[in-house]
From Swiss-Prot:
Residues 1-107, 311-335, 475-496, 882-906 are annotated as: Disordered. Residues 985-1047 form the FIP-RBD domain. Residues 750-985 form a coiled coil. This is Rab11 family-interacting protein 3. It comes from Mus musculus. It comes from the Eukaryota. Residues 775-879 are annotated as: ARF-binding domain (ABD). The lineage of its organism: Eukaryota, Metazoa, Chordata, Craniata, Vertebrata. It is a peripheral membrane protein. Downstream effector molecule for Rab11 GTPase which is involved in endocytic trafficking, cytokinesis and intracellular ciliogenesis by participating in membrane delivery. Recruited by Rab11 to endosomes where it links Rab11 to dynein motor complex. The functional Rab11-RAB11FIP3-dynein complex regulates the movement of peripheral sorting endosomes (SE) along microtubule tracks toward the microtubule organizing center/centrosome, generating the endocytic recycling compartment (ERC) during interphase of cell cycle. Ca(2+) 1 binds at residues 509, 511, 513, 520. Keywords: Calcium, Cell cycle, Cell division, Coiled coil, Cytoplasm, Cytoskeleton, Endosome, Golgi apparatus, Membrane, Metal-binding, Phosphoprotein, Repeat, Transport. Homodimer. Interacts with RAB11A; the interaction is direct and is required for the recruitment to endosomes. Interacts with RAB11B. Forms a ternary complex with RAB11A and dynein intermediate chain DYNC1LI1; RAB11FIP3 links RAB11A to dynein and the interaction regulates endocytic trafficking. Interacts with dynein intermediate chain and dynactin (DCTN1); the interaction activates dynein processivity. Interacts with ARF6 and EXOC7; the interaction serves for recruitment and tethering of recycling endosomes-derived vesicles to the cleavage furrow/midbody. Its main location: membrane. One of its GO terms (cellular component) is endosome.
Length: 1047
C-alpha cells in the first residue's frame, strides 16, 4: 500500500495551488477556523504532491512562539479539517516539518498520519476542541502545549473493534482479511471527524511512527489491505460517539463499542490548563490507557485530574486493558514530556498486576503453537506471561518478551503478514527465524524455521534464559512477571554459533571465494565508525596475510568475546539484597548476537551507520561514572527529542534490519525489548547529537537492579532521528524510567579489576609493539630519504645534460631556419622578375588593341547607317502591308454580305419554285378529272402524271447538285487564295524579323560565339521556311493544281 508523503515549504518554495491550498473562509455553519494568511514562526503554508492521495492541511497562524494554536472561537467546531474529498490530511507531520499543521484526512483512499512527533515540536497535533484547551493526541518531546486530539461528532459511527462471541477473547485485530475497521466515518458536514477509515475494505494502521521519517503517519485508508486495526462491530449500524462535544461539553471522548460503554477520550475540556493526553494519565500511575472492547470496562484514553483511579483504557475485559502510555509519578505534570526534553518517549506501560495487562491490539491465537504469524503484540488472556510483538512496518519488529513460554497473538490468517505496512519500495525478504533446540518449552517470537513470512527481515532471537542472564535493552512493562528478552551467555551449540558467524562471513565475502580481504573489512569498519580497526584486524588476521579466512574470523570473534579486549568490561557491585549482574557473559554473547544480526542486515549490500565492533569498543572512554555527570549537551534537539543521560543506547541501522538497545530502569521482573529497525534508506541525520557508548554494564542488568552507565564517547553519536525512532517504535519505555532518580554507581568487583589489569597489560604490550614498529618505520624512512637524495642528485645531473642538449638543438634549428629563409627570398625574387616580364608583355598587347580601336569604330558607324536604311525600308513595307490587309478585310466583308444576299435570293427562288410545282400538280389533277369526265381511261392519265412528276423532281435534283458544285468550287478557290496569301505574309514576316536588326549592330553587341549561334538559328529558320513552302506546294497540287498553271 502506498502512502502519500507530504512535502512542505522546506522542500518547495511555493505553496500548493488549486484545491490543495487552504482557502480562508467558513466551510460549514459551525466551522470557523483560524487560517494563516502569511507564514509565521510556528505556522507555514504546506505544500503537498498533486496526486489523488495528496493531503490537505491548513496551517494555523501563531503569534506567540509557545502558543498552542489559534483555533476557532467556537468550542464545538472541529479544527484543521480537510475540505477536499480526494485529499489526505496529515494529523501531525512531526519528523520533517517542524511548523507544518496536523489534521485528519477526509478521503477514504488517502492515508491519515497519526502523529510525527519528534522532528516538529511546534506544529499543532490534532483538532483541538476549545481555543484554550490543548489536547495531546500523542506524546510530544519539546512542546508540551501543542494541542492534540480528535474532534467529536455525535452522529459519526465509529467501529473500533468487533466484539467476539467469547467474553475472554481479546477484542482487537480481525482474523479475517476482509473484516472492516471503521475508526471513523466521514460525513459531509465540516464538523465531522476527519481521521478514521472510510472504505469498507480499508485497513486501519495505528501509526507508522519513526522508521520511515518521511512517510505519512496515520491510518491509511486504501482498501484491500491485510492488517486491520479492529474488526467491524457485529452491528455495523451501532453508532459510536467519540464525544458529544457539540451538545454535551463534558461528554466522554472515546470510541465505545456499544451504546452503554463509557468511553472517555478526555474527561475535562473546560479547564484551559488541563490538557487531554491521549496516551498518558496524570493522577494515577496505575491507570490503564487502552482501547475499549466490552461494555463492562470503562475506556479512558486520557482521564485527567478528576478520576485518578479510573481505568483509562478502552478495555477488552473487565480486568484487561492496554496501556497506551505510562504516566508520570508526579500528579502535577501536565504533559509527558513537559520539563523533560531529554527523556525518551515511553509509549506503553503495563500494570503492576501480572494478569491485569492484555494488549489492546492483539487477538488471541486460536492455536498456542501456531507459528505462521511473524509477529504479535499481546499475550493471551489465559496465559499470565505471554509475549508481545509490535510490528509497525515491513522492516520494524518490536518484540515484547514477557515469558519463556511465548505465545503468538494477532493472527489474522495463516499467511497474513501482521505488520503495519509502510510506503516502501524495497524487495520482500524473508524473516530469518531460529529455533532453540535446547529449550523446548521456550518459544521465540519467530517461527522455528526460515520462512518468507512477510516483507521484513527478522533477527534470530535466542531463547530466554534465567533472570540473571538478561540483556536489558529497554525496560519492559513493570507488572509483567515474564523475564526480558535475553541473549544467552553462550550459544546453544558450537554448530549454531558457527552457522551465525558463517552468515556474517558470507555477507562480508563479496567475491564468494571463501576469503574476506582485509582492505574491505578496514573500509567497512572505517566507514561505519569503528575506532579500533587495527585491534580488530590483529584478531581477525593474526598472520597478516591480507585476507581473512572463516577459521580466522571465527577464532577472532571467539577471542574478542572471551577475552573482551575492546569492550572494556567492568562489573558493578550489586546493591543490597541483589545479586551481582552477570555482565561479561551476557556481553560476550551479545557480541555473538551482534555478529549474527549484522549477518542479516548490515552487510547485505547497503549502507549502514555503525559497524559491529564500533558498538562495543572505545579506546578513549572507558571510565565508569555517575549518570548525573554526563553532560547535558549529549542530546540532540534537532528533531525536538532527546535522550536522557541515564539511557545509553546503541543502534545498528542496516538495510533490512537492525538492533536497537536502550537500557532503562529495572523492574521486579526485568523486561527487555529488542527493536528490529529497518529502512536504512530513510536514515538522515538532522543536526549533530552526541551518542552514548554502550558498555557491558549497560547491556547487562540483574533481576531488579539498575544498570551502571559509562561516560558517552563523542566519537559515537546517535542522531536525533535514531533516538526519535526508538522513542516511538519501542513502545515499552515508561515514564517512571524518566521520573525515578538515576541509579547509584556501584563498585566493581575484584574480578573486574583483574580484567582491567589484564587489559592494561595487553594495551602496554600493544603500545610496545607499536613503538618498535614506529622505530622500524623511522629507520626505513631514513633509508628511503637517503635513496631519494641520491636520486635527486642524479636527476639534477641529468637535467643539466638535457639543458645543454636543448641549447645545441636550438642553435641547430636556428641555423636551419636561416638557410631556409635565404632560399625562400631567392625564390621570391625570381618570381617577381617573371611577373614583371609578363606585365610588360600585357602592356604591349594593350597598346596594339588601342591602335585598332579607330578602325573598328568606323566600321561600326558604317554598319549603323546601313542598319538605319534597312529599318526605313522595313517600315515602308510594313505600312504597305497594313494597307493591303485593310483592303482585304473590306473586301471580305463585302463578299460575305453579297453571299448572304445571294443566299436569301436563292431561298426565295426555291420557295417560289415549290409553290409553282404545287400549283402544277393541282392543275394536273384537275386536268385528269376533266378527262375522266370526258371518258378517257384513268390509267393512262395516271401513268403520264407519274412520269412527268418524276421527271420534274430529277431536273430539280440536277439543278441543285450543280449549284452545290459551283459553291464548293468557289469556296475552294477562296481557301486556296487565303493559303497563298498567308504563306506570302508568313514568308515576309520571317524575312522582316530576320533582317530587322543591323548586321553591324549585332557584330558590335555580340561576341564570336553568340554570332555563330545566331547564324545557326537563322539557318534553322530558313530550313523551316523551305519545309513550309514545300508543304504548301504539295497541298496546292493535291487540291487545285490549276492555280499553278502559267496562263
Amino acid at each position: 500500500m502506498e502512502l502519500c508523503q507530504p512535502t512542505s515549504l522546506s522542500d518547495h518554495d511555493q505553496p500548493a495551488s488549486g484545491p490543495q491550498r487552504g482557502v480562508m473562509g467558513l466551510v460549514g455553519p459551525d466551522a470557523p477556523r483560524g487560517w494563516s494568511e502569511e507564514p509565521e514562526e510556528h505556522a507555514q503554508l504546506q505544500r503537498w504532491p498533486e496526486g489523488p492521495n495528496a493531503p490537505i492541511c491548513w496551517p494555523e497562524e501563531v503569534e506567540e512562539p509557545h502558543a498552542p494554536s489559534r483555533w476557532a472561537k467556537e468550542p464545538n467546531a472541529p479544527r484543521c479539517s480537510s475540505q477536499e474529498p480526494d485529499e489526505s490530511c496529515h494529523l501531525a507531520e512531526e519528523l520533517e516539518e517542524s511548523d507544518s499543521p496536523r489534521c485528519w484526512p477526509q478521503e477514504p483512499d488517502t492515508p491519515c498520519h497519526l502523529a510525527k512527533e519528534l522532528e516538529e515540536p511546534d506544529a499543532p497535533r490534532c483538532l483541538p476542541q476549545e481555543p484554550d484547551t490543548p489536547c495531546y493526541l500523542a506524546k510530544e518531546l519539546e512542546e508540551p502545549n501543542i494541542p492534540r486530539c480528535w474532534p467529536q461528532e455525535p452522529d459519526v459511527p465509529c467501529h473500533l473493534a468487533k466484539e467476539l462471541e467469547e467474553p475472554d477473547a481479546p477484542r482487537c485485530w480481525p482474523q479475517e482479511p476482509d473484516a472492516f475497521c471503521h475508526l471513523l466515518k466521514e460525513v459531509e458536514e465540516p464538523d465531522a471527524l476527519r481521521c478514521w477509515l472510510q472504505g469498507p475494505d480499508a485497513p486501519c494502521h495505528l501509526a507508522k511512527e519513526l522508521e520511515d521519517l518521511d512517510s505519512p503517519r496515520c491510518w491509511p485508508q486504501e482498501p484491500d489491505e491485510s492488517c486491520h486495526l479492529a474488526k467491524e462491530l457485529e452491528e455495523p449500524d451501532a453508532p459510536c460517539h467519540l464525544a458529544k462535544e457539540l451538545e454535551e461539553p463534558d461528554a466522554p471522548r472515546c470510541w465505545p463499542q456499544e451504546p452503554d460503554v463509557p468511553c472517555l477520550l478526555a474527561k475535562k475540556w473546560e479547564e484551559s490548563d488541563a490538557p487531554c493526553l491521549l496516551t498518558e494519565e496524570l493522577e494515577e500511575p496505575d491507570a490503564l490507557h487502552c482501547w475499549p472492547q466490552e461494555s463492562e470496562a470503562p475506556c479512558l484514553l486520557a482521564k485527567e485530574l478528576e478520576e485518578p483511579d479510573a481505568s483509562h483504557s478502552c478495555p477488552q475485559e473487565a480486568d484487561t486493558g492496554c496501556l497506551s502510555a505510562k504516566e508520570p509519578e508526579e500528579p502535577d505534570v501536565s504533559h509527558l514530556w513537559q520539563g523533560v526534553p531529554d527523556a525518551p518517549c515511553l509509549l506503553v506501560k503495563e500494570p503492576e498486576e501480572a494478569d491485569a495487562l492484555h494488549c489492546c491490539w492483539p487477538e488471541e491465537s486460536e492455536e498456542p503453537d501456531a507459528l505462521n504469524p511473524p509477529c504479535f503484540w499481546a499475550n493471551e488472556p489465559d496465559e499470565p506471561d505471554p509475549s508481545r510483538c509490535w510490528s509497525e512496518e515491513p522492516q520494524v519488529l518490536c518484540l515484547w518478551p514477557e515469558e519463556q513460554n511465548t505465545k503468538r497473538c494477532w493472527q489474522e490468517e495463516p499467511d497474513a503478514p501482521c505488520f503495519w505496512p509502510e510506503d516502501r519500495e524495497e524487495p520482500i525478504v524473508s524473516c530469518l527465524q531460529f529455533k532453540e533446540p535446547e529449550k523446548p518449552k521456550v518459544r521465540s517470537s519467530w517461527p522455528e524455521e526460515l520462512e518468507d513470512c512477510c516483507p521484513t527481515r527478522g533477527l534470530p532471537l535466542e531463547p530466554l534464559l534465567a533472570d540473571g542472564e538478561l540483556l536489558q535493552a529497554c525496560p519492559g512493562p513493570p507488572s509483567d512477571p515474564g523475564p526480558a528478552l535475553s541473549l544467552p551467555s553462550e550459544p546453544g551449540t558450537a554448530q549454531e554459533e558457527g552457522a551465525r558467524l558463517r552468515a556474517v562471513f558470507d555477507a562480508l565475502d563479496r567475491d564468494g571465494d571463501g576469503f574476506v580481504r582485509i582492505e574491505d573489512f578496514i573500509q567497512f569498519a572505517t566507514v561505519y565508525g569503528a575506532e579500533q580497526v587495527k585491534d580488530l584486524t590483529q584478531y581477525l588476521d593474526p598472520s597478516g596475510l591480507g585476507v581473512i579466512s572463516f577459521e580466522d574470523f571465527y577464532q577472532g570473534i571467539v577471542a574478542i568475546r572471551n577475552g573482551d579486549p575492546d569492550g572494556q568490561l567492568y562489573s558493578v557491585e550489586p546493591v543490597q539484597d541483589e545479586e551481582t549482574p552477570a555482565c561479561a557473559d551476557e556481553f560476550d554473547d551479545f557480541v555473538t548476537y551482534e555478529a549474527n544480526e549484522v549477518t542479516d542486515s548490515a552487510y547485505m549490500g547497503s549502507e549502514s551507520t555503525y559497524s559491529e565492533c564500533e558498538t562495543f569498543t572505545d579506546e578513549d572512554t572507558s571510565t565508569l561514572v555517575h549518570p548525573e555527570l554526563q553532560p547535558e549537551g549529549d542530546v540532540d534537539s534537532a528533531g525536538g527529542s532527546g535522550v536522557p543521560s541515564e539511557c545509553l543506547d546503541t543502534m545498528e541501522e542496516p538495510d533490512h534490519g537492525a538492533l536497537l538497545l536502550l537500557p532503562g530502569r529495572s523492574r521486579p521482573h526485568s523486561q527487555a525489548v529488542v527493536m528490529v529497525i529497518g529502512s536504512e534508506e530513510h536514515f538522515e541525520d538532522y543536526g549533530e547529537g552526541n551518542e552514548a557508548e554502550l558498555s557491558p554494564e549497560t547491556l547487562c542488568d540483574g533481576d531488579g537492579e539498575d544498570p551502571a552507565f559509562l561516560t558517552p564517547s563523542p566519537a559515537k553519536r546517535l542522531s536525533s532521528r535514531k533516538v526519535a525512532r526508538y522513542l516511538h517504535q519501542s513502545g515499552t519505555l515508561t515514564m517512571e524510567a524518566l521520573e525515578d532518580p538515576p541509579p547509584e554507581p556501584v563498585e566493581c568487583p575484584e574480578e573486574d579489576i583483574a580484567d582491567k589489569v589484564i587489559f592494561l597489560e595487553r594495551r602496554v604490550s600493544e603500545l610496545e609493539k607499536d613503538s618498535a614498529a614506529a622505530g622500524e618505520q623511522h629507520g626505513r624512512l631514513r633509508q628511503e630519504n637517503l635513496q631519494l637524495v641520491h636520486r635527486a642528485n642524479a636527476l639534477e645531473e641529468q637535467l643539466k645534460e638535457q639543458e645543454f642538449r636543448a641549447q645545441e638543438k636550438v642553435l641547430e634549428e636556428t641555423r636551419k631556419q636561416k638557410e631556409l629563409l635565404c632560399k625562400m627570398e631567392r625564390e621570391k625574387s625570381i618570381e617577381i622578375e617573371n611577373l614583371q616580364a609578363r606585365l610588360q608583355q600585357l602592356d604591349e598587347e594593350n597598346s596594339e588593341l588601342r591602335s585598332c580601336t579607330p578602325c573598328l569604330k568606323a566600321n561600326i558607324e558604317r554598319l549603323e547607317e546601313e542598319k538605319q536604311k534597312m529599318l526605313d525600308e522595313i517600315e515602308e513595307l510594313t505600312q504597305r502591308l497594313s494597307e493591303e490587309q485593310e483592303n482585304k478585310r473590306k473586301m471580305g466583308d463585302r463578299l460575305s454580305h453579297e453571299r448572304h444576299q445571294f443566299q436569301r435570293d436563292k431561298e426565295a427562288t426555291q420557295e417560289l419554285i415549290e409553290d409553282l410545282r404545287k400549283q402544277l400538280e393541282h392543275l394536273q389533277l384537275l386536268r385528269l378529272e376533266v378527262e375522266q369526265r370526258r371518258g378517257r381511261s384513268s390509267s393512262l392519265g395516271l401513268q403520264e402524271y407519274n412520269s412527268r412528276a418524276r421527271e420534274s423532281e430529277l431536273e430539280q435534283e440536277v439543278r441543285r447538285l450543280k449549284q452545290d458544285n459551283r459553291n464548293l468550287k468557289e469556296q475552294n478557290d477562296e481557301l486556296n487564295g487565303q493559303i497563298i496569301t498567308l504563306s506570302i505574309q508568313g514568308a515576309k514576316s520571317l524575312f522582316s524579323t530576320s533582317f530587322s536588326e543591323s548586321l553591324a549592330a549585332e557584330i558590335s553587341s555580340v561576341s564570336r560565339d553568340e554570332l555563330m549561334e545566331a547564324i545557326q538559328k537563322q539557318e534553322e529558320i530558313n530550313f523551316r521556311l523551305q519545309d513550309y513552302i514545300d508543304r504548301i506546294i504539295v497541298a496546292i497540287l493535291e487540291t487545285n493544281p490549276s492555280i499553278l498553271e502559267v496562263k
